[in-house]
């Protein structure tokens, strides 16, 4: 199980430094990873085209760098599907956009957290690449360690 450096730094109360990319090309991940300058790389899926295969290759490239985590910026439409498939591909953290209410935020959290009584989520155990070689306990820990970021950008989100 790959360590989630972003989660570790946040848990320690330390600052983080990330960068954004608008392409899922693994070569970009490798260039950024070899720089050693960033704690995480955020793929801005909200504004670019990608396939599920490209997400998996992005996740594979991230695994080359134990000191760098990853994040997927997810748009409003289809966010549950995109977020869970990103995690299952190996992207460790998720940034949700366009939340308009506290209920929207709670829904985003449910998408990520495992479907256990303790976690209260709806994300079932994955039989995809990220969980291969992991057991259910490790997988639940991965989902609990996922940083769930919420972009507050809509008037309703500020008011609610």
Task: Provide a role label for each language-model segment.
Residues 1-160:
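Expand to "…catalyze enediolate/carbanion chemistry for C-C bond making/breaking, isomerization
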């Amino acid at each position: 199980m790959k360590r989630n450096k972003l989660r570790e730094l946040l848990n320690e109360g330390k600052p983080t430094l990330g960068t954004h990319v608008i392409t899922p090309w693994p070569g970009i991940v490798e260039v950024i990873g070899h720089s050693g300058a960033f704690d995480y790389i955020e793929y801005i899926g909200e504004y670019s085209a990608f396939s599920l295969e490209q997400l998996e290759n992005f996740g594979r490239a991230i695994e080359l760098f134990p000191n760098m985590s990853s994040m997927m910026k997810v748009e409003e439409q289809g966010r549950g599907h995109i977020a869970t498939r990103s995690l299952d591909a190996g992207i460790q953290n998720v940034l949700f956009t366009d939340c308009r209410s506290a209920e929207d935020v709670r829904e985003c959290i449910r998408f990520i957290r495992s479907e256990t009584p303790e976690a209260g989520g709806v994300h079932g155990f994955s039989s995809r690449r990220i969980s291969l070689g992991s057991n259910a306990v490790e997988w639940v820990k991965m989902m609990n360690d996922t940083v769930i970021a919420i972009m507050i950008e809509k008037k309703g989100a500020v008011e609610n």
